[in-house]
Amino acid sequence: MKLASFIYQDIRSFGIVKAEGMIDLGRRLGDRYGDLKALLQGNGLAEASRYLDDAVDVPMGGVTFLPVIEQPEKILCVGMNYAEKRKEFDQHNPAPTLFVRFADSQTAHNAPVLKPRHSREFDYEGELAV
């Protein structure tokens, strides 16, 4: 089950991602869960999964994605977690590097990613687990 936060017709919501659009869980479960973070914290995945086979409420063409969790408390990251990546940078420590990210450094699906002027390229290693 793929989940996302999004805007549709100027209304913020969250839902289940399907190829043809979104099942709007905000509309269906919003009285109990105000956003995707609340759904996850409130163990609402079982409730959400009841709608998996439903038709979409929102066409994909009208969706503007938001960062998955808009106001995370913490973003803890693991860097250099692949052996091949460590070799690329001549790192011999077998333990991965831990670092933090800030909420305002997130971007949404299909949103532009801005490269800092002092960087020559983007780093291609990026993963997110919630």
Predicted regions: what is each one?
Residues 5-7, 101-103, 126-128:
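Short, structured patches in soluble enzyme cores that scaffold and shape functional sites
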Residues 12, 21-22, 103-105, 112, ...:
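Structural motif
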Residues 80-83, 102-104, 118:
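Beta-hairpin (beta-strand-turn-beta-strand) motif
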Residues 1-96:
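N-terminal non-catalytic cap/leader segment that marks the start of a structured domain
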Residues 108-129:
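A structural-propensity feature for long, helix-poor, extended segments
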Residues 92-109, 124:
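Structural signature of FAD isoalloxazine-binding scaffolds in flavoprotein oxidoreductases
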